[in-house]
Swiss-Prot record:
Its EC number is 2.7.11.10. Belongs to the protein kinase superfamily. Ser/Thr protein kinase family. I-kappa-B kinase subfamily. Residues 753-758 are annotated as: NEMO-binding. GO terms for cellular component: cytoplasm; cytosol; IkappaB kinase complex; nucleus. The lineage of its organism: Eukaryota, Metazoa, Chordata, Craniata, Vertebrata. The keyword Kinase applies. The active site is at 158 (proton acceptor). One of its GO terms (biological process) is tumor necrosis factor-mediated signaling pathway. One of its GO terms (molecular function) is IkappaB kinase activity. This is Inhibitor of nuclear factor kappa-B kinase subunit alpha. Keywords: ATP-binding, Cytoplasm, Kinase, Nucleotide-binding, Nucleus, Phosphoprotein, Serine/threonine-protein kinase, Transferase. It catalyses: L-seryl-[I-kappa-B protein] + ATP = O-phospho-L-seryl-[I-kappa-B protein] + ADP + H(+).
């Protein structure tokens, strides 16, 4: 009995969309798109009209032989038992579609909206390979998926860009393996000798119909990764598989690339061809990994098993590459990127020493900014320069500034031309055959895109400098508000002090003739008044306030400047023109046709000129930003000095106020004591009024040298002093209220400040 019949679903009803996949649907499921067509089946996207749920349905489009029906059903069996984030997941077939088509059941799978890897590679901007972040993401995802399949004793056998789909999950692109129609379950036999699949990515042993193992997937995977790096397959990619097979099979085990010269000679290499987009620190381990994956000998391919872990060496090396901690630093003084492999627990200071050796900028003058404008924390390790899970120099950058410079000279020399591009720039009218011209123009497009991306990175560095400036400015505003608040509090205290001391001096003068007097105290109070006038100089911060306001105006103008926004529109337009030219060239038949490169060279020259212009504007604007930042740095210590002066004046005023209060209370104590003594003397005199000996007669010289007791206060004088003290206490209450209001005003100042100009 056929395996399809064992499943039991009824045959498809007549006229449903799945018969020939016309526009239509099954019940609430509407067909929205045709996703792909394989050797036997179609894959279409269906969407539920009510819930919006989407599912990819694979249906058979041909009448199959018994053998192929078994293979079809075998794929469904494999899909249903797999569960891995990098292998496309099988779903339950919707009830409305649960029927047979061409005597086999349907396969329902999760829908991945990002298209396949071939679609990504075919984009003209990727004609010389993908970005490093994309390559490393693919390496991680597909490597993990292949390991999972092999651990479950499944060989895919047909790995190719068309069978890798992309899905956006939470803003991160995930790669998934699809189409297990050719997969071989090793439980059916450890080796297999039959295969019909895509030849360009096929392992050599499959050409020769030899026995094979899991290492056939290594060859296909290595070929895919090479293509993602370089933009083309590694071995004579322009030739048909059966042609290059004979020329390549005697290659050295370490050869990972072969190209055909104009004279027909095949040139082998152990290195990746230029241009590509991967960092120099990754190139060597990546070449070593490709040498393992592209070994012609299936027994040696993958490097065998590691004796300690019993894992394939190729996957251990892959994990090593993916776990490298590399910090990429854009030197804004030279527009050059320097990369460093971080050591475990490396300190930031040690990294800065390495940066000094590479760039010549001393550690003391280095300012390392993240994209957010935050300066790296010297107390934290150097690993703060990288983000876990984020790989590739095109994804994350640290920006290096020289604090000893505020004027950055620019623009700098543009990136160097490749040998091929330089060839057509030197003579744009030279006629080249179309196949060769495609390669040259691909590198030209890569060069134009590179110029635009160089500008974009420098603009991001300028933006980091602006964000850093705004952080400094926010700190300046905070310190200014503290200074103004402290100045206002000091002014209020000094006003109170002047008013109270003037009143004290007036009242002291009023009672001095008949009350208590002290020349020493009077002199001290007058000195206090003069000292308070001197303290008032500390509250004068107008000159600083003027400088700060002028600087604020300058910063706002820089924010409003058109150079604060990206100026790459012209380069983007030129990039699109270069891409369009390349597209037109690819549509031309390659046979016996020649063409020149006049139009492409014009675009290259215009892009270089445009980049030169926008970089000149960028570095001019950057120099102004750094100039403003330096002004803030210069102002901050002046504000600190002003705050310290205000604090010292405040302390001095409080000490004088306390000293005067203590003296007043001392006077009050004396007055009260004298009042009590006088009352006792008066009572005693009244009791002995008839006794002459008890009568005290002042000496004749008292007019010039009064007896000490002559300054003793009368009861009425004591009451006057009590009034003075009460009045001083009233002033003290008023002063406390003024201080409280000043504190509340300070607390509200930051909240109510208009920050809109910072946006």
């Amino acid at each position: 009995m056929e395996r399809g019949a064992e499943r039991g679903p009824p045959p498809a009803p007549g006229g449903v969309a799945l018969r020939g996949q016309p526009a239509g649907g099954c019940g609430p499921w509407e067909m929205r798109d045709r996703l792909g067509t394989g050797g036997f089946g179609n894959v279409c996207l269906y969407q539920h009209q009510d819930t919006g749920a989407r599912v990819a349905i694979k249906s058979c489009r041909l009448e199959l032989s018994v053998k192929n029906k078994d293979r079809w059903c075998h794929e469904i069996d494999i899909m249903k038992k797999l569960n891995h984030p990098n292998v496309v997941r099988a779903c339950e077939v919707p009830e409305e579609m649960n029927f047979l088509v061409n005597d086999v059941p349907l396969l329902a799978m999760e829908y991945c909206s990002g298209g396949d890897l071939r679609k990504l590679l075919n984009k003209p901007e990727n004609c010389c390979g993908l970005k490093e972040s994309q390559i490393l993401s693919l390496l991680s995802d597909i490597g993990s998926g292949i390991q999972y399949l092999h651990e479950n004793r499944i060989i895919h056998r047909d790995l190719k860009p068309e069978n890798i789909v992309l899905q956006d999950e939470g803003g991160k692109i995930i790669h998934k393996i699809i189409d297990l129609g050719y997969a071989k379950d090793l439980d059916q036999g450890s080796l297999c000798t039959s295969f019909v699949g895509t030849l360009q990515y096929l392992a050599p042993e499959l050409f020769e119909n030899k026995s094979y193992s899991v290492t056939v997937d290594y060859w296909s995977f290595g070929t895919m990764v090479f293509e993602c790096i370089a933009g083309f397959r590694p071995f004579l990619h322009n030739l048909q598989p059966f042609t290059w097979h004979e020329k390549i099979k005697k290659k050295d085990p370490k050869h990972i690339f072969a190209s055909e010269e104009m004279n027909g000679e095949v040139r082998f290499s152990t290195h990746l061809p230029q241009p590509h987009s991967i960092c120099s620190l990754i190139v060597e381990p990546m070449e070593s990994w490709l040498q393992l994956m592209l070994n012609w000998d299936p027994e040696q391919r993958g490097g065998g098993l590691d004796p300690e872990t019993n894992s394939p060496k190729c996957f251990l090396l892959m994990d090593h590459i993916l776990n490298l901690k590399i910090v990429h630093i854009l030197n804004m003084t030279s527009a050059k990127i320097v990369s460093f492999l971080l050591h475990p627990e490396e300190s930031l200071h040690f990294l800065q020493n390495r940066i000094e050796s590479e760039t010549g900028i001393s550690t003391g003058n280095q300012e390392l900014l993240l994209e957010t404008g935050i300066c790296l924390d010297p107390r934290k390790p150097a690993s703060q320069c990288v983000i876990d899970g984020v790989r590739g120099w095109d994804s994350y950058m640290v920006y290096l500034f020289d604090k000893s410079k505020t004027v950055y000279d620019g623009p700098f020399a543009s990136r160097s031309l490749s040998e091929c591009v330089n060839y057509i720039v030197q003579d744009s009218k030279i006629q080249l055959p179309i196949p060769q011209l495609r390669k040259v123009w691909a590198e030209a497009v890569h060069y134009v895109i590179g110029l635009k991306e160089d500008y974009s990175r420098l603009f991001q560095g300028q933006r980091a400098a602006m964000l850093s400036l705004l952080r400094y400015n926010a700190n300046l505003i905070k310190m200014k508000n503290n200074m103004v608040s402290a100045s206002q509090q000091l002014k209020a205290k000094l006003e109170f002090f002047h008013q109270s001391i003037r009143l004290d001096l007036e009242r002291y003068s009023d009672q001095m003739a008949y009350g208590i007097s002290s020349e020493k105290m009077l002199k001290a109070w007058k000195e206090m008044e003069e000292k308070a006038s001197h303290c008032a100089q500390a509250e004068d911060i107008g000159y600083l306030d003027e400088q700060i306001m002028a600087l604020h105006t300058e910063i706002v103008e820089l924010q409003k400047s058109p150079y604060a926004r990206r100026q790459g529109e012209v380069m983007e337009s030129l990039e699109q023109r270069a891409i369009d030219l390349y597209k037109q060239l690819k549509t031309r038949p390659p046979d016996h046709a020649y063409s020149d490169s006049t139009d492409m060279v014009k675009i290259i020259v215009q892009t270089v000129q445009s980049q030169d212009r926008v970089l000149k504007e960028l570095f001019g604007h950057l120099s102004k930003l750094l100039g403003c930042k330096q002004k803030i740095i210069d102002l901050l210590p002046k504000i600190e000095v002003a705050l310290n002066n205000i604090k010292e004046a405040d302390n001095s005023e409080m000490q004088m106020q306390g000293k005067r209060q203590r003296e007043i209370w001392h006077l009050l104590k004396i007055a009260c004591t004298q009042s009590s003594s006088r009352s006792l003397v008066s009572s005693s005199l009244e009791g002995t009024a008839s006794t002459p000996a008890a009568t005290w007669v002042p000496q004749s010289s008292s007019e010039y040298a009064p007896h000490p007791l002559s300054s003793m206060a009368t009861p009425g004088d004591g009451e006057n002093f009590v009034d003075v003290i009460e009045e001083n206490l009233n002033y003290l209450d008023r002063f406390s209220s003024m201080l409280q209001e000043a504190r509340e005003e300070q607390n509200n100042s930051l909240t109510n400040f208009d920050w809109s100009w910072l946006k």
